[in-house]
Amino acid sequence: MNNETKRTRLTVQDMVRLSVLVAIMLLLELTGLGMIKTAGLEITIFLVPVIVGAIVMGPGAGAFLGGVFGCISFWECFGKSWFGTMLLGINPVFTFLVCVPTRILAGYLCGLTFKALHKLDKSNLWSFGAAGLIGALCNTVLFMSMLCLCFYHTEYIQGFVAALGSSNAFLFVIAFVGVNGLVEGAVSLITGAAIAKAVMYSRGKLAARKTNA
């Protein structure tokens, strides 16, 4: 009976945490802080709550929060994002595929990665940062792969290809992501991992693990 109560309580706690993270993502969207634009860069902050949820609550939570991120991204295609608006005008279905499933899978893979790495990281030193970095990498790779699959041969994307001087899809991805991808990776590695680790300490998970070790 106690075990069942404990499992129920943990489930409720996770639902509360998910609600808080979703609220943070919506707040980021409403305030315009979810996408920081400066010096030609667009740094995605939405990925941080996804990474935190994936690390703290597992792949399922990561997938759910990734879905929220994807839906917000798709919503921005209706006027807020000039790039997304152009894609939506070309093909709405493909635009949805670029925005939503890629983020769901990125969140899921981030949680799955942390689950695997954390078993090896007995010192709790590197698994958080590695999962955050891989989460950002998965988001970028999946997004750009779907973008190329769905839109690479369109006149709009070919305009970018010509402007960047890319001779193939791979070089286009490298040139298009560039410094932006590196900065997002650093933000996810440092911020997402640090917050997730702090939350897990507050839950007593890491402390209990060290005691058992």
Name these PLM-found stretches.
Residues 1-213:
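Loop-helix junctions at membrane interfaces
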